[in-house]
Amino acid sequence: MPAPFEKGSEKKGATLFKTRCLQCHTVEEGGPHKVGPNLHGIMGRKSGQAVGYSYTDANKKKGVEWSEQTMSDYLENPKKYIPGTKMAFGGLKKPKDRNDLVTYLASATK
């Protein structure tokens, strides 16, 4: 079972985003979709709902509402959490890294 989310370091999360996520995602309002969707406004949104992005049926049907905890659970092992997702990222195994990244995402995607 994934570790409970605990607020982490936004600064360390920003660094993780730049090194592990930026090649496929943007976070700013109106930012473009890349290989993965723009993440602006993701917290509180259901999976597979970013307008203009072509999701797999698995992402659309999962129906998870993104929160700090669900995002942390997903980022531990995306392909296990949503079998059939096209997200190629293998996941962040360390709870601290997930906490830092999710803390950054919660702030940067508002």
UniProtKB/Swiss-Prot annotation:
Gene3D superfamilies: Cytochrome c-like domain (1.10.760.10). Belongs to the cytochrome c family. PROSITE patterns: CYTC. Heme c binds at C21, C24, H25, M87. Keywords: Electron transport, Heme, Iron, Metal-binding, Methylation, Mitochondrion, Respiratory chain, Transport. GO terms for cellular component: mitochondrial intermembrane space. This is Cytochrome c. It is found in: Mitochondrion intermembrane space. One of its GO terms (molecular function) is metal ion binding. InterPro entries: Cyt_c-like_dom, Cyt_c-like_dom_sf, Cyt_c_1A/1B. The lineage of its organism: Eukaryota, Fungi, Dikarya, Ascomycota, Saccharomycotina. The gene is CYC1. The modification N6,N6,N6-trimethyllysine is found at K79. Its main location: mitochondrion. It comes from Scheffersomyces stipitis (strain ATCC 58785 / CBS 6054 / NBRC 10063 / NRRL Y-11545). Pfam families: Cytochrom_C (PF00034). SUPFAM superfamilies: Cytochrome c. Electron carrier protein. The oxidized form of the cytochrome c heme group can accept an electron from the heme group of the cytochrome c1 subunit of cytochrome reductase. Cytochrome c then transfers this electron to the cytochrome oxidase complex, the final protein carrier in the mitochondrial electron-transport chain. Binds 1 heme c group covalently per subunit.
